[in-house]
Amino acid sequence: SRMKAQDQKELMRERICDCAKRLFEREGYEQVSMRQIAAEAGIAVGNLTYYFSKKEDLLKERLNDIQETFSESIQLERGEISGKPFWEYENRTLLELLLRFLKAVEQFQKNAAIVYENYSRLQKTVPVFQEMSREWTEKIMTIYNGLIKQLWERRVFRKELEWDEYENLIYLIKLLTFFGQEMHGDQEYEKKRFTERICRLLIPYISWEWKDTYTVLCKEICEVSFHRMTLKFI
């Protein structure tokens, strides 16, 4: 019976989270009140606060779920993929991993749209979000950094360019990853997907011998094709 009560509690928790997710996506996080969430879940506000005392807690829960899904989908930890360090992978596999990672980030952005559309505002107004997003940004940037550095050291990326140039590139990727979504409604921006923008951004950094492999992988993994003339300039 205690197990049953525990299950029911868990089910109610999930139901509240689903209702909050729907409302946040439909109305926007700022607009939704705890009263609305309770009504949508068909419970009293007092019952709702038993599970979640503040609206922020619901956003945090949502973000936790999305982050877990993302982490599972890529199995990436600091400097390791599926338990193996970056340097144990072949060059081509590393390049593939970078592109697959971009795709996973794009999917994550879609799932977390409500968060990303309000990214800078939420960072200022929701303390718990500020903390989570800092850790999260760090985690994603560590992976970008690790993969790009490894590819640069192996000359898949142009080694004659100083590492400074790549730090600048990584900073641009960071802006597109975390703030690109805020440009919603900007027609020019929305003409291209996140992955396509990054694939194009990386082109001039790819060393000549890897150009063909890179373009093949971009097409296979990210469904991005380049004009022949563009490639002539690399």
Descriptions of predicted regions:
Residues 1-2:
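Short, Lys/Arg-enriched N-terminal segments with co-localized hydrophobic residues
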Residues 15, 19, 23-61:
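Helix-turn-helix
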Residues 61, 75-114, 170:
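Hydrophobic alpha-helical connector segments
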Residues 64-71:
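Short, basic, alpha-helical segments at the C-terminal edge of helix-turn-helix-like DNA-binding modules
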Residues 109-131, 145-146:
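Amphipathic alpha-helical segments used for helix-helix packing
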Residues 128-156, 164-175, 199-203:
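Amphipathic alpha-helical packing segments from all-alpha helical-bundle domains
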Residues 149-150, 182-234:
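C-terminal peripheral helix-coil segments that are non-catalytic and often amphipathic
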